[in-house]
Amino acid sequence: FEPGPVKTLFGHAMVATMRRAAAVGPSPNRITLLRDADGDGIAEQRHVLLDGLQQPFGMALVDGQFYVGNTDGVVAFPYADGDTRITSPGRPLCKFRSNGHWTRSLLASPDGRKLYAGVGSLSNIGDMGMDVEQGRACVYELDLATGERRTFASGLRNPVGLAWEPTTGA
């Protein structure tokens, strides 16, 4: 979040709130790893696990691959237990159009064969027309073996916080 010219009371309140939450300024485009080395619930170690990303949001670890949901797509990186730095350039799994609701939540299927990625709409109420909303406001199902993707759910303004129902797995 980078504030532009503030012209309304709402704008002033929003900027003040974002500053208080330390959310003012450009994204550092990195993922920081915090480790609790002695098990006391406090992270003693801090490492930049991965940088050079594009507004990373969602993360999933499946079979030695660390998946990152960037605003412009999903990228896979090799990962081994204990790693504190990933230097591989990564392998793009799929591309998304950026802008609009930029969060990209990720969720692995229980069997680890598929990855689900939430992509928000460009606007709030389709006020820029529906053509610009194509491929948005949905959850994609990504096949990790083939790289194929299909729309799993649609009509969702900004699908964030994907999860499986713990009892049924649905």
Give the role of each language-model region.
Residues 1-170:
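Beta-propeller domains with acidic blade repeats across secreted/periplasmic ectodomains
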